[in-house]
Amino acid sequence: MRKLQFAMVALFAVLLMACASGYHDTRVVNTQTGVEKDPQGPYQSLVVGALVEHELRGHLENAIVARFAEQGIKATAAHTVFGDKGIEGKSRDYLAERMQENGFDSALAIHLEEQRSETLEVKGDPGAAVPIAGTMTMRPQVFSDDFFVNEDIYVVRLDLWDVAQQAIIWQGNTVSFNTGGFKGLEKGAGHFAQVITNAIGKADIF
């Protein structure tokens, strides 16, 4: 029993450290190929753009480009070519022309569709029941108090474009969970990149 108590305390300590340092996970909800038109590859030069105003935008784009490179796919982070210019109000003709001018035949657009925060209650370990001194009443030993963790949830839509056709040829949706705030997002960029590049890889478009 004592070994079990020590194991529970150790497990709780690990959980507490994970929450303090930031936990980040991304999952693919669904994917679809041939959304507007079918892929007409081969595609030789992809531009990756995170269409959200955030100081980690460049960090995320770079992480995705690095993952594509590991798969043998030539990709470029949009911020290194187009800076911080958004696409709000720009026509498909204009965007396609700009991308073709810079040698891109495909584009991955990352849209943040929803962001919300939830507070999660983590129950402390009650331990084993022990008798109250001088009585026959049993009560649990409490090794740790309950505590609360703030979790940020991000719902993302991914659009893969064929520039020449001006059409979405693949689309995916992901949900990410983050408890580490800014640091959690920074640490989670690599995992997010791995998840979405693997999903695109399974579509066998490149």
PLM feature spans:
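Sec-dependent bacterial lipoprotein signal peptides
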Residues: 1-19
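Alpha-helix termination/capping residues and helix-transition junctions
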Residues: 13, 40, 101-104
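C-terminal/domain-edge helix-coil "capping" segments
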Residues: 19-43, 138-206
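Second-shell loop/turn segments in exported
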Residues: 46-55, 80-86, 144-147, 178-185
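Hydrophobic alpha-helical membrane segments
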Residues: 40, 67, 131-133
